[in-house]
Design a protein with these regions (language model features):
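M16 family metallopeptidases and their MPP-like homologs
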Residues: 61, 66-81, 87-90, 104-197, ...
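Boundary at the C-terminal end of the N-terminal hydrophobic targeting segment
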Residues: 41-44
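An aromatic/glycine/proline-enriched structural segment found at the starts
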Residues: 198, 202-206, 219-222, 237-247, ...
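Bacterial N-terminal signal peptides that target proteins for export
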Residues: 5-28
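Catalytic Zn2+-binding segment of zinc metalloproteases
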Residues: 93-103
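Bacterial N-terminal signal peptides
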Residues: 28-37
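Non-catalytic, conformational "gating/processing" segments within enzyme and secreted inhibitor domains
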Residues: 204, 208-212, 226, 230-231, ...
Length: 496
């Protein structure tokens, strides 16, 4: 089937495959409070689940309102499984370079050159002498030129486009790697064939050029003047855990990539029992299974090594972390805490608490201090890792002579209002409604719903997680918010 598809199109054009996925949250104005009391469902239809014979999990969310499907393959493998090496991210790039049948005019002739390139990268990783390294790099360059004679750049993307595909992309996080795109439902056979094929027999071609792309990405991040401070905070917060190293890899590791290590990473984690397929849109789950068994069912069966959660350091005994920000005149302070994880019974109350601090309408407790000029700006943030949820807030005093101590005091005064229940009932209901409305809108859009299900699969929350969360949001009371806010007290670990 794949060979037939390839023969239909042989067009090459330059494209970039990697893009960090951005998840957007939509908020409504407080006028929607007038609609309180009406029913609301977090999802438009239930998710249908089944497992292929090789252990691969399939979640299908049908939505026949538009003729499109959003498909995502989720691998529970990311930066935490290769700390500091950047292998998960490197491999994500390689997955767009084709297979033994896609992206090549003659794989049998190409393979010896690719094997030689892999061996040279292994040699480079073990060589410290600069002169010898330069010789190896030059040899790799000459081998890459020879191998390039057989490569067809961008063929995978072109095939996806030929068969109704768009938005082709991927991303790597600490906990997962996700490959996704939108496609027309009449091409589901071709989509399944192409996407399963690259998960069975990826070929590590055109690596030298992709290495340069990753370096450019690293340099792009390095151009951010706040990056050094962010990386220092990351090492401090997560020391002793797989989350302390940069996701893209350390500079030293990036200089010594090994294709053989990427192959081992693929063999270890890209197995049926460690992968999920999410399909949202105009598909019929009841008729899909035979097709998926013929395509994704070909992926090698197996389970990945068990992940062990490493405890975070005890932040309560750590000193304040002092960071230098390269912004003249501006001072900033903040706090970072552990938050309730995604399936924690207090999760819904925690989300309401964060919304009461700051929201799109700028009516939160921290927002009010910005609106009235008590400080320049403030914002709470929360982020969910597979193992932990972090909650934090940063604040900036008035410029140029605002006091950081005063801003700190104002911050805790607002937190105290949460702990003491000094919140208007309508503000509580508005926060709940806003969060529920976001869940509802996510359920109405194939891409947003897919994003929710990708996260739920990766973090092992279950496909019913959005509904579970919506049910608990409806039940949140002010007493729940007070209880959840109580642990956040002055004197715990700070960032400034």
């Amino acid at each position: 089937m794949v060979t037939k598809l390839i023969k239909l199109i042989r067009i090459a054009h330059l494209s970039s495959y990697f893009c960090t996925m951005k998840r957007k949250i939509f908020f409504l104005s407080f006028a929607i409070l007038l609609l309180l009391g009406t029913g609301m469902s977090a999802q438009t239809s239930p998710v249908k689940e089944f497992v292929l014979h090789n252990g691969l999990t399939v979640w299908v969310a049908e939505d026949h309102t538009q003729p499109k499907v959003f498909g995502a393959v989720v691998v529970r493998a990311g930066g935490k499984d290769c700390p500091g090496t950047g292998i998960a991210h490197y491999f994500e790039h390689i997955m767009f370079k084709g297979t033994d049948r896609i992206g090549t005019v003659d794989y049998a002739a190409e393979r010896p050159w690719l094997d030689s390139i892999s061996a040279e990268y292994d040699k480079l990783a073990k060589t410290a002498d600069p002169v010898e390294r330069l010789k190896i790099q030059r040899h790799i360059n000459s081998l890459s030129i020879k191998a390039g004679d057989y490569a067809i750049p961008n063929e995978f993307e072109n095939l996806i486009s030929q068969y109704g595909g768009s938005r082709l992309n991927a991303y790597t996080s600490f906990d997962e790697t996700v490959y996704h795109n939108e496609f027309a439902p009449q091409y589901i056979v071709q989509w399944c064939t192409l996407n399963s094929d690259r998960l069975i027999s990826p070929v590590f071609r055109l690596f030298q050029g992709e290495l340069e792309t990753v370096y450019e990405e690293k340099n792009m991040y390095s151009d951010n003047p706040l990056l050094p401070a962010a990386e220092t905070a990351q090492r401090f917060l997560f020391r002793g855990t797989p989350y302390e190293a940069p996701l893209i890899g350390t500079t030293e590791q990036l200089k010594n990539p090994q294709l053989s290590e990427m192959r081992r990473f693929f063999d270890t984690y890209y197995v049926g029992g460690n992968m999920g397929l999410i399909l949202c849109g105009d598909v019929k789950a009841d008729t899909l299974r035979p097709l998926l068994e013929r395509t994704f069912g070909r992926i090698r069966a197996g389970v990945a090594p068990e992940r062990h959660r490493v405890p975070l350091p005890d932040w309560s005994i750590l000193p304040t972390l002092k960071l230098k920000l390269p912004i003249p005149v501006v001072k900033a302070g903040g706090y970072v805490f552990r938050g309730p994880e995604e399936r924690n019974p207090d999760r819904a109350a925690f989300m309401v608490m964060v919304n009461l601090l700051s929201n799109k309408q700028q009516t939160g407790l921290l927002d009010s201090l910005s609106r009235t000029g008590r400080w320049m700006a403030a914002m709470p943030l929360s982020y969910d890792f597979g193992d932990y949820t972090l909650f934090g807030a940063g604040f900036v005093p008035k410029i140029p002579f605002g006091s950081l101590k005063k801003a700190d005091r104002l911050f805790w005064q607002q937190i105290s209002k949460l702990r003491n229940g000094q919140i208007a009932p309508q503000a509580l209901e508005a926060a709940k409604w806003e969060l529920l409305r976001t869940l509802e809108k996510n359920g109405e859009d194939a891409i947003h719903r897919s994003n929710e299900l990708v996260n739920a699969y990766s973090h092992q929350l279950g496909s019913d997680y959005p509904d579970w969360l919506a049910d608990r949001l409806r039940q949140v009371t002010m007493a729940d918010v007070e209880r959840v806010a109580r642990p956040y007290k002055e004197g715990v670990w700070a960032l400034s």
